[in-house]
């Protein structure tokens, strides 16, 4: 189920457009995640008290977390499925410390695609979107596999 060279070209090409403004992209991803799937916000003690979009937008912690999420994802994507060294500690923390269900990874991955499509409509056509979805599915599947290794059924 790996990606072809052409698919990786699409993924890394759009990621190069995302990277210069990870904080804005990441902030939007986190806010959208909380809007569309409010149950995910309950996983974050530091975000539980943020009740409005304005509060979420003005939170430096939301921006910081969004940047952290997309920075980690970018490192994994750039490794083109040779991501074991980056993925293992991420999966371990999400499985054993944070207890983030795989379902939530599905939610955030789809939101990442939507946010990129909104911010880069002319650069993120159907082929690029399909390639990104495939790369993110690979990431989720590998995270789920690691979760099981850590005894978390997530």
From Swiss-Prot:
One GO MF term attached to the UniProt entry: oxygen binding
Keywords, comma-separated and alphabetical: Cytoplasm, Heme, Iron, Metal-binding, Muscle protein, Oxidoreductase, Oxygen transport, Transport
Transport among keywords: yes
Coiled coil stretches, renumbered: none
Function, as annotated: Monomeric heme protein which primary function is to store oxygen and facilitate its diffusion within muscle tissues. Reversibly binds oxygen through a pentacoordinated heme iron and enables its timely and efficient release as needed during periods of heightened demand. Depending on the oxidative conditions of tissues and cells, and in addition to its ability to bind oxygen, it also has a nitrite reductase activity whereby it regulates the production of bioactive nitric oxide.
Family: Belongs to the globin family.
Protein name as it appears in the record: Myoglobin
Organism: Graptemys geographica (Common map turtle)
Originating gene: MB
